[in-house]
Structure formats: structure tokens, C-alpha cells
């Protein structure tokens, strides 16, 4: 489903700023070579280009005439084949990552058409800053001012020259990596710590030289040495902190260097928040984009770091990228942590393994796996799923929740669940796990194992915590899936970080996050909010803004989440049946009881959907159509949208050929309005509210347009099979989509077994029903050639 960002004008103007062009024909864009270079041609919706690069060059030329600079913004990829489907080119002052940026929203977006051409389909010309004169220079990446090249003790810190090694010739003794880290060579002997022959020494800091946002380095190695030298002058020690990887290709995009007293993992640490973060630029260099110089402990200026810097091979990626760093403890010894922590008690393994083996005798499709520690062969994480869960994943695994509620409190058992939402919008179990620790390795193993158990069927979207190990594992196992942060975790961090702000800001913050409808509107309101309260330098606000695609509703609406609420808390699948105080001897019985209760609720909804008919509230044929197809719960949601559509006014604002644009406004509420685009040639429709993209159900705005156009039956593309009464057998529709014969047979076995269990349940409720069920089986058996 393709998202469409739409910016609306006022209802009285009855014209939308951005729309998809219809039948736009240009020969060579209608622009001569001279015009492209410097005439007064301005960008407009419908302008065509042969390539995205040609569009960028055109926008650069326009920017040079107008007086601003350009950066390459977001790109969007096809969910079908991963090719780039659209690109954004933005004003260089877009965002707030650097002090020079003002949150400007000016941009153009070009979209690839089926013909291979690129068409300008969205544009914003207004800037929120003063524009320069004629001849401004193109800027595709931010180029902030560089640091001067100070010297001390014959050492030069030269951020101007990429790949420049910073070496102190006055001290050539071997040093280890900063902050208690050593480079661990996997290719050497077991537990071997490498002493690289080529050694790079710590750069001596220069009096008066401090890190600042915008400082550039040729490599991450150079940045690390600079920060360590600075730390020696100021009086603290450095550790290498988190790294962040690209969701596209997995390459490292940013790194953090932190005070050695950051965190609370050891007695010597006290939660110090001082750090420096560097971000990779398109040029290959690195730039300081975030910085906190404040420490919460006493400093000791001039005190040497116990651990210096070893030279890290420069592989062209800026150093540090290809090196595994094993953290040493802070107690002075040099023993490497060879084993991971295990939060699962040893007594759990025999209990669970016995249970799994007994289940496999009853359920041929029962799956379980145990992770083994590569160092000592001990058991680590555990995953299991019965045949019902595996079958449910084939139907309702398109959007899932990785629930780690045990992390909220003092749970003694690290029990996690993977859940989906069925055609009754009820949670369904897709798998369970005991997570040994919260490392990337643990989550990577878990997601890969779940994917194997589900025959490789990948979700389109995932709701999970925003912790770095989980993010890294998700990107690696499910590339392309939209990761949405858990609402409870976002709320917790908001409560923690919004305490110092005035109540007026909190009110406007909530309004900005949860009431803006489009991406353009959110970015504009956020920019105004930050400027109003002078908060461009606030570290937390910068961080959450950079991660807005993972939690801001306006950015989530274009992705399918099967109706999982954006703002609400998702209740644990097992509720209060399994909690922190569940004793070992009762875990299995409580687990089975709660699971059976959930599945009984699902069976009741199946029965109600097939045997109960809700009352119709209109005389519209589409209501009768959807009553026949949808489950009871989903139909009521659709029915409410249909009834609410009567409270809206609809006005055509644009028409060209088969394409029309409508503005749909609520009666008595000028502020609630949305744009609907409709194609008469194929009945395709899209709405700026993006309800269909997000939930898979048509919104009241499109239904209003359909009513106006006298469309009496919904096109089949708008009736998602996953919401229908027979959604459980939807895998039959995918039989020719590349599913292997073995996986297809497994799906058929699970499907027939589930149908048979329901058949037996109803057939044994009375003697009369038993006779009827037996007769039906006999007749069916004849068709299957069971009987001769």
C-alpha cells in the first residue's frame, strides 16, 4: 500500500496544494538546456525527469537562483522488490540536527512512474528563514565549519584532512583501546587478545580545544582519539558506547563515545550523561552531531587514561566498524567476558523440555528450539510454538507485537511472546520465548528461530521496544519491516524527560504528536514548537525527532498495523495468569489454561460471525455487502465509518481526465477535513487520513465520495481477506506464490487439524449433532475416495 502525503488548503479555497498529475505530457520536460542551467523555470507538480539525479540537479539550479541550499532527503523503497520508488530533496536547513538548521519544510518529492520517468508529485516552496541572493551554491550534505588545527607537543589534530592519523611521536608505548576495551581477534586462539604490531597512540589534547557540534573527522578512529585526548585534559575516562546501523544496508551510521562512568552496570559507574556522538556523512567523513559536556561527578584534569588507543585498521569505512569490541570489567583485571548472562534459572530447562516432548506426542506440528552458548555449550534462550500458533502466523503474521512486558518490573522469569491480531481483532499467539539475556545475539537467535518455525513468512510491521539490541536484530532478520516503538516505553520516557518543561509546552507537545494528520503538518508544527520555546539544543528532543518514523502517528499511518492501537497500551496476551510471582510448578498449568481461554474466545467469535447477523443502519448496498463478508467485529467498525460519513460534506476540488480530487469536511468543524483522490478508470481511491493503509478498512471520507459517485459495491481490493469470515483459509490464495511443497503441506495439515478440532467440538455437544456430523463425514469421505 503506497502512502500519499497530502497538504490541504482551506475549505473555501477548494484547491489542494499537492496532487497527482493526470495525463501530463512533456517533451524533454519542456525545458531547454539553457533553461535548466539558469532561467526562471520553477518546480511544479507534474514536472517530469528522466532520472532522479536530473531532478536533483534541476532543484539545485532553482535553489541557486532562489537563495538556499539543497540536501538529499528521504528515499522510499517498494515493498515488492526493494527498488527506490520516490525521493525527497530538501532545504539544507531542514531538521534540527545541527545548530545551522531551523526546521525548514521546503522540499520537492519525485516519484518513479511505471514508464521509468520521475514525476514531481509533491512540493513545498515556503521557507522559514531568510533566503540568500542569486548564485547560492548547491549543498548536498551539511558542511559545517571545521575545527582549527591546534598543536601541542608536536601533535596536529587536523580535521580538514580525511584519513589523517593523529599520532603522538613523543610517546610510542603500546596502549589498549579506550575505556577498558581491547580488540578481540576471533581468528586467533580462544580468548586471545590481539597486540597489533602497528600501534596508534593517544593524541595529546590541546588547551582550549573542545569538541563542538559540527566538528569533522576523517575517520571514527580519529574522532575517538580526539575525544580521549580532550578527556585527559578535562579529567575523565572514555568508553566506546552504542553504535547505530543503517536499516537499508546494515552499515554503521553513527557512534557514541561516553564517559566511563556512564550507566550503572558496575559500582564505579554513576549514570554520567556526558558523551560525544559522531555521524557518518555521504562523503565518508564523520561529524559531531550530538554532544553533552556535563558530568555528574568530580573531574581530575591532567589525569591520564589507564587505557589508550590501539591503531585500528583503516578499511575505508572509518575504522572501528569491522572490529569486535569486548568490554573489560572495571575492577582492574583483564579477564574477557567469555560467557553471557543467563536470567533463566537452571531448574526451568528440564521442566520445559519435558513439557515440549510430551506436547510433540500430541501435536505433530509442535516446534521448539534451544539456544546453546558457543563457549560452554550451556542452554540459553528457548523458543516454542504449537501448530495452532504456526497456522495463525500464516494468516495473521503480517503485523506482530514482540511483547517483553517482563522488562517493565521485577519479573523473575524473562517470558516474552510474539502475538498477532486475527480477523476478530483479537490477539493470537504466534510464539513464546524465554530470553536468556538482552543482548543482540539473544534477540537475533530468537527472531531467526521464529522465522524458521513460521516457514519464512515475514511480517510487514513489528511493534517492539526501542532498545538498541532489539532494533539491530529486527533490521538484520526483517529488513524492510516497519518497526514501531512500544507505546508504554515512549510514555515512560516522556514522563521522565518532560518533567523540567512548563505545562504549556507539554500541552502543545501532546497536540503536536497526537493531533497532526500528515508528515508535513507534523514537521511544521514541531519546528514551530521547538523555535517557540528555544529548545533546538535539547538532546532528548533531538533524539526522538530523529526517530520519529518509529513512533509519531503521522509517520506510522502509511504502514499496515492490522488495527493495533497507536497510542494505547497493548495488554499482555496471558494477562494476570503469568506474572512475576508465578511459581515454577504452576507455570505450565497456568500457561495452558490461559491459552485455552484465549482460543475459546476466538471460537466464540467464529461462531457468532457465522450465526449472528447485525442490524443494518442504512440502505446502502455496500453495508449489506460487507455484512456478508466481514466478521462481526470488523463489520461493526466498517458500519460506524459508513454511518459517520453522513456527517460530512464532500466537494470536488480538482478534475483532469479520470482523476478527481475531493475535499471532505465534517459538518460544523472546519478543522477536520481530508483530501480524497479518486480514479474513475479503475475505482482506485486514497485518503489523506490513510486509514485503509494503516488498518485495511475504508474510512468515512472515501465512503462519502463513493456515496456521492453512486458506487454501490466496494471493489474487491478494498475487502482484505484477513478481515473476512473465512480468513483462516487464506493461505490457499497464496499457493502459487513460491511456497515450497513441504511448507504448503504443513499449512494444509495445520488448517485441516484446526477445522477438525472445531468440527469435533460441535459434533460431540449432543447425540443428534454427533449423528449429523458423522453423516456429513461419510458423505465427504466418499468424495475423497476414503470408501470404495
Curated annotation (Swiss-Prot):
Where do Basic and acidic residues bias regions lie?
165-175
Single biological process term from Gene Ontology: regulation of DNA-templated transcription
What's the protein name? Protein FAR1-RELATED SEQUENCE 12
Q: Which residue range or ranges hold the MULE domain?
A: 399-495
Expression tissues: Expressed in hypocotyls, rosette and cauline leaves, inflorescences stems, flowers and siliques.
Tell me which UniProt keywords the record has, alphabetically: Metal-binding, Nucleus, Repeat, Zinc, Zinc-finger
Zn-finger (SWIM-type) intervals are 674-710
Q: What induces it?
A: Up-regulated in hypocotyls by far-red light treatment.
Ranges where the record places region Disordered: 127-200
Listed Low complexity bias regions: 142-151
Domain FAR1 residue range list: 57-133, 225-301
Q: Give the UniProt family note.
A: Belongs to the FHY3/FAR1 family.
The portions of this protein that span the membrane are none
Q: Which GO terms describe its molecular function?
A: zinc ion binding
Q: What does this protein do?
A: Putative transcription activator involved in regulating light control of development.
Q: Which gene encodes it?
A: FRS12
Q: Which PROSITE patterns match?
A: ZF_SWIM
A Gene Ontology cellular component where this protein is annotated is: nucleus
Locations listed in the record? Nucleus
